[in-house]
């Protein structure tokens, strides 16, 4: 996605070792807009220093987007660490049964989208009555833009049945993850 799909839209991605802050900082360029990271890296489940990376991103005026698919909101809450946007693949733990493709985007409401790095959000959008999303909804400019423009133009919306299936998973999320934690503790104690 980041390397191949986004490049088709003119988005360049630089991959770095998230455990090497000097490497991360060295990769930040004048045109860098986003620092994207995972709370639990795939495929190794490595855990980066979330606070240090978020602080570094903000030092350079970047929006920090955290993929919390494997961390889940039950175990890790990136917004409490200062992340600007958190994304989840709802297909995995949130849905809990792997039958439905879906995702979640949560915005902190604290991001200044008017820094000059995000003209899509901070300037007038003629296809939406001239609205500048960062002015009209400063606490939710990113998610409102996605909903008002990207959903309208690209149609990435799940069916009502799939939405229902994901809701079924959220009803047992805390119970399932509590059990995961309990079982993990037992395995660690045994080893």
Question: Where do the model's predicted regions map?
Answer:
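Conserved PLP-enzyme active-site core in the AAT-like
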Residues: 1-191
């Amino acid at each position: 996605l980041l390397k191949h799909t986004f490049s088709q839209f003119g988005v360049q991605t630089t991959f770095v070792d998230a455990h090497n802050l000097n490497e991360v900082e060295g990769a930040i360029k004048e045109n860098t807009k986003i620092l994207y990271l995972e709370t639990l890296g795939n495929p190794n489940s490595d855990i980066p220093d979330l606070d240090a990376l978020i602080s570094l991103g903000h030092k350079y005026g970047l929006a920090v987007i955290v993929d919390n698919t494997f961390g889940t909101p039950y175990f890790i809450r990136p917004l409490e660490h200062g992340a600007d946007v958190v994304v989840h693949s709802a297909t995995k733990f949130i849905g809990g049964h792997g039958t439905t493709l879906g995702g979640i985007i949560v915005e902190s409401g604290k991001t200044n989208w008017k820094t000059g790095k995000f003209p899509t959000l901070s300037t007038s959008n003629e296809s939406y009555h001239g609205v500048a999303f960062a002015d009209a909804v400063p606490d939710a400019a990113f998610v409102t833009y996605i909903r008002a423009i990207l959903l309208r133009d690209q149609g990435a919306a799940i069916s009502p049945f799939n939405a229902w299936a994901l809701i079924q998973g959220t009803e047992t999320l805390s119970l399932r993850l509590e059990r995961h934690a309990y079982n993990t503790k037992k395995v660690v104690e045994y080893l």
